[in-house]
């Protein structure tokens, strides 16, 4: 049996081949009724779009890259799942690259890995600086995740400073006064850790609590062993916190282990809150309070924005009336309060 073609879909739907093409390419000017009729015809006949041919005609590969520091960090694995799902809905394939938080790898990603294989890149940088983004040509189109490094770049994130302020307020509202920030960084950088530390400091100031730089517990990376080591070291050196703000859930889960080994009860003696709402925090003992970013929204906004930039970059001359200014998109977050701060899970 011959494969159905566009003209077969058009005949079945009672429309022109051009209208079928417009529906396939998701042009906005097609009426909802016509769009529905054409899609029903496509489903009935089993018509399949030749994606490779369509992409090549438009000067595209149909492939985007997602570049994250480490895939075995649960937040990035969960984010990748959402990005893949969102891209599939737009007939895009996702190539996942692990940068290892290495500046050379992140710079290579910004340059499109030295090839035209990918149409655009979603990049979560940890090592790049604002200077690294200066003088970019805009090719390949790139959307940054995390903190805004440079005003001229498209960017999607939660409001990390506000989220950390809210999490610290929650701890203070429980009557905690000796709040340590695990992974906190008190420098002038523009990264996520610095933004969350600013939020932590702002909440202390609001409550009239003094800020002590020694309350920032440095970590080598944002993994469970690093959180455990940082908290164990602080306790061994005589620190007596009654709360921990951990800059991600991996650090928080490590902190829970260290507190347990030192005979410290959670949350009776020390309340603990993390960031990211990864699956492991829902099954830890106690379950972990956390800041939950809307990961699905981060993925959706990032893919939408990148697709728009790709269309701008590959459109024929005169087909785009004006290039949209760089976008700084903030997506929602919420506090999820569980046993590690409340003693029970809030429903």
Positions of predicted regions on the chain:
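Hinge/beta->alpha junction and helix N-cap segments in small-molecule ligand-binding domains
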Residues: 51, 69-78, 96-105, 156-166, ...
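Flexible loop/turn connectors
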Residues: 232, 236-243, 248-347
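Flexible loop/hinge segments that line or gate small-molecule binding clefts
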Residues: 124-166, 186, 209-210, 250, ...
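Short beta-strand segments enriched in small/hydrophobic residues
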Residues: 12, 17-22, 57-70, 170, ...
């Amino acid at each position: 049996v011959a494969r159905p073609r566009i003209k077969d879909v058009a005949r079945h739907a009672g429309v022109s081949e051009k209208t079928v093409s417009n529906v396939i390419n998701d042009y906005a000017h097609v009426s909802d009724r016509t769009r529905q009729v054409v899609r029903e015809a496509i489903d009935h006949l089993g018509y399949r779009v030749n994606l490779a041919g369509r992409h090549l005609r438009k000067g595209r590969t149909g492939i985007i890259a997602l570049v994250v520091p480490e895939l075995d960090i649960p937040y990035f694995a969960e984010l990748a799942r959402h990005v893949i799902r969102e891209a599939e809905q737009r007939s895009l394939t996702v190539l996942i690259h692990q940068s290892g938080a290495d500046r050379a790898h992140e710079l290579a990603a910004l340059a499109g890995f030295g090839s035209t294989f990918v149409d655009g890149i979603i990049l979560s940088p940890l090592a790049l600086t604002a200077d690294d983004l200066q003088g970019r040509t805009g090719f390949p189109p790139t959307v940054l995740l995390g903190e805004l490094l440079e005003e001229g770049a498209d960017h999607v994130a939660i409001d990390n400073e506000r989220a950390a302020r809210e999490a610290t307020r929650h701890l203070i509202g429980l009557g905690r006064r000796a709040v340590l920030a695990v992974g906190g960084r008190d420098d002038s950088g523009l990264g996520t850790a610095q933004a969350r530390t600013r939020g932590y400091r702002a909440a202390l100031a609001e409550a009239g609590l003094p800020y002590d730089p020694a309350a920032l517990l440095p970590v080598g990376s944002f993994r469970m062993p690093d959180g455990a080591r940082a908290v164990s070291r602080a306790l061994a050196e005589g620190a007596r916190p009654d709360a921990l703000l951990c800059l991600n859930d991996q650090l928080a889960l490590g902190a829970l282990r260290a507190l347990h080994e030192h005979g410290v009860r959670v949350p009776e003696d020390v309340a603990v809150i993390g960031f990211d709402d990864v699956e492991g925090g829902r099954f830890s003992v106690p379950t972990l309070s956390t800041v939950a970013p809307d990961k699905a929204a981060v993925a959706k906004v990032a893919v939408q924005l990148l697709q728009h930039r790709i269309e701008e970059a590959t459109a024929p001359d005169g087909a785009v009336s004006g290039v949209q200014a760089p976008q700084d998109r903030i997506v929602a977050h919420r506090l999820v309060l569980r046993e590690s701060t409340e003693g029970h899970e809030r429903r």
